[in-house]
């Protein structure tokens, strides 16, 4: 997964956190797999538009260096996560605060997400009509909670979850 030439400002140059304000981040079909290491993209007052599959590079699991495990997060604040009908596989953390997760058009394709989804996902279910065999793991939308989030947490993600859980607790 290559960084766009200009993604916006990096609020923490010591980690792979990229922030884009008042613009959309578009993932195109020819995007390369997410390579070794963790990274977080924060999109504020814009949308994450996913037009192609997002996958992890096949990196051997190394118990001596968790930082090599590919891991990615997208946090959208005051915007939506839009998923094209041709997208069938996503990997990573997809979070929207004050927005929705939706399909850009109707699709009869299944969608498999390896990672974590946080936000209003109901509109996405309304756009997908695939009917598979649930006993074979062929749901319309299948979310597999991936352990890499715990081994190599994308930077900034822990702080976002701590803030959100504190707000829920109050």
How would you name each of these model-derived features?
Residues 82-170:
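Predominantly polar beta-repeat domains that present long G/T/S/D/N-rich surfaces used to bind, process
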